[in-house]
From Swiss-Prot:
Chief site of localization: mitochondrion
Lineage: Eukaryota, Metazoa, Chordata, Craniata, Vertebrata
Organism listed in the record: Mus musculus (Mouse)
Protein name: Delta(3,5)-Delta(2,4)-dienoyl-CoA isomerase, mitochondrial
CDD domains reported for this sequence: crotonase-like (cd06558)
Motif, Microbody targeting signal: chain positions: 325-327
Annotated S-S bridges: none
FT transit peptide: 1-33
Protein residues bound to substrate: 115-119, 173
Amino acid sequence: MATAMTVSSKLRGLLMQQLRGTSQLYFNISLRSLSSSAQEASKRAPEEVSDHNYESIQVTSAQKHVLHVQLNRPEKRNAMNRAFWRELVECFQKISKDSDCRAVVVSGAGKMFTSGIDLMDMASELMQPSGDDAARIAWYLRDLISKYQKTFTVIEKCPKPVIAAIHGGCIGGGVDLVSACDIRYCTQDAFFQIKEVDMGLAADVGTLQRLPKVIGNQSLVNELTFSARKMMADEALDSGLVSRVFQDKDAMLNAAFALAADISSKSPVAVQGSKINLIYSRDHSVDESLDYMATWNMSMLQTQDIIKSVQAAMEKRDTKSITFSKL
């Protein structure tokens, strides 16, 4: 590894000193720090992002380097209509290329996160495909399902960390969506429901593929899938589906934005590289993942972000004072 690094032996010594003396600073987020960030974030009025204009979602700049993507059909309980499946793909493709964005918070407007697919709007597309040849209808439906699957895969493939903030119901397609996010917070009144079996079909846009890897309990996933029962917030926390539960929506959003602000203050090279390698490691063996990591870092270890971080640590400056270049 030393061979791969193009830094001096003195700087390597500084790196070791940094790891010994400032690990808590770099790897632990204190509740006090999060509370301060949350208060600061709540004072800022969200600003519309000019190149994100949609019918079913709203994108605002919550704070510096942080975007807020909100499911925005509260009168329909944020049901996922035809526009949603197209717009979320467009939205996250833009976010992936947005060099100023370093973290994303996804939430739902109104009384709940989402009620899932909008059956009234989607019925004609799903239930009455054109044509009378079974093979051709099958190919049409396969292409349609693949298109819907991409709607949530773009979240997973987005290199910026995505935090889901869930309140009220998260039903059907909502579980597919949050399973593709990196971090999940919820309110005490939240519940999660894999509803598809009650509609006569198997969930087909990500839940069955991602949820077992998220919570690591195949028996529980099977139970939730086969029965369509509700998983309440406390059970979601115990199972590992969410990492924190909050009393109400405001407290949850404040914490989500505080975490996003903290993440966005870190090196984007380090954060985005970590997300990409975590996802790769989830789907590959340890040996394959270590090899991928070595190949990745043979380039990334040459970043100026390391030098900036070490200098800040040696000067006892807050890491938030470092100015990292856009990525």
